[in-house]
Amino acid sequence: MLGKEWENTSFAEIGLLHQAPNDNDLEKFQHALTLMSEADNSSDLLIPLISDFLIWFYYQKTPLKWIPFLGHFFNTWQSCSFPPRRYLLAKILSGRISELLKVSPFELAASVTSQDVVEADSLVEENELQAWLEKQELVPSSSNFLNSFWISGGERELTEEEQNSLLQSNTTYTNSDLPASKQLESFISMNLSYSKVFFLHLLQHSDSSFNDKFLLLLANIPVTVSNVEVLLYLLQQEESLAQFDLNGKSFLYHMLVSLHNQVTNTSHLEKQRISTVATLFISKLFEIPSLSEYLSSTLFLDLQAFCIVALPQSAKLFQKVKALKNNP
C-alpha cells in the first residue's frame, strides 16, 4: 500500500523505501498493476504521482519504448487534467524524470505551474510515441472515443463507474472506435465477465462497418478459454450472429477457418491445447439447436476439415458430426 507519509518524501527515497520487486518480469508486472489500481481508487490526488513514478522506477533500466506500461503512461498523459501528474508523466515520456528525483510529491504538486506543463509537454515526442504504440498494436491507429477504455481495460479491471459509462452511452460506434487486435485480447483477459455484456452492447450500437470489422476481429481471436467463453456467450445470446455475413461468408465460417489455421500453424504442444479448447467450444455450440443444424449442414465440410486436423481431441465431436449429417 502507498502511504500518505511518502507524500513529503523525495521521489528518490520513495523508490528506495518501496523496494522494487526482483527482476522477475511477472512479479514486476503484477506489482505495477496493483499500483495502477491504487491510483485509480484513491481520492488522494498525490497517490497517482507516487504510483506512476514507482511503475517507472520498476522499469528504469528498460528502454522507454519497451516498458510494458508505456501505453498507460502515454494515454494517461494525453487525457490527464491534473497538472502535476501530467507534468510528471511528460518527464517520464521525454526521458527527463531524473530531474524530479530530489522533490517530493507534495512539493511537485505545490510548485508546478501551467507554463511548466506546457514546456514539459513540448519535450515529449508525441507523434513518434504514437506511431510506435500503433506499430506494437498497443493503441488503435486513430484517436477515438473508446481509446482510453481499450487501453485501461487491457491493463486492469475497469471500475464500475467506467463500465456503466460505456453501457449508458448513446454513442454510435464507427471504425475509429475499433480496438487493435492485441488490445481486444487484453481487454477480455482483464474484464472477462464485463466483455460479454459490453461486446453485445457494441454490436447493438454501432454502424455496419464497425460490426463487420469487430466481428472479424472476434472470429480470428486466439483460442484461449476466456476468449471462447466470450464467443460462446455472444452466440448464445444472439444466435443470428452465426450467419452474419462478412465478406460473403458467415461469422461462424470465418471462426471455423481461424480455428483450423490456429491448430495447423503451431507447435505440437499448442496444437493439443488449441484442439482441446476449440473442440469443447464447438461441442457447446451443438447445444444450440439452430447452430447445430447450421454446423452439420451448411458448414459440414468446414467443420469436418477442422475435426480432421484437431484429431485425436476432436474424435468424439467428429463422430457426432457425421451422425448428424447421416441422420438429419
From Swiss-Prot:
Q: GO annotations under biological process?
A: nuclear-transcribed mRNA poly(A) tail shortening
Q: Record the organism.
A: Schizosaccharomyces pombe (strain 972 / ATCC 24843) (Fission yeast)
Top-rank taxon of the source lineage equals Eukaryota
By what name is this protein known?
Answer: Uncharacterized protein C23H4.16c
Cellular-component GO terms for this entry: CCR4-NOT core complex; cytosol; nucleus
High-level lineage: Eukaryota, Fungi, Dikarya, Ascomycota, Taphrinomycotina
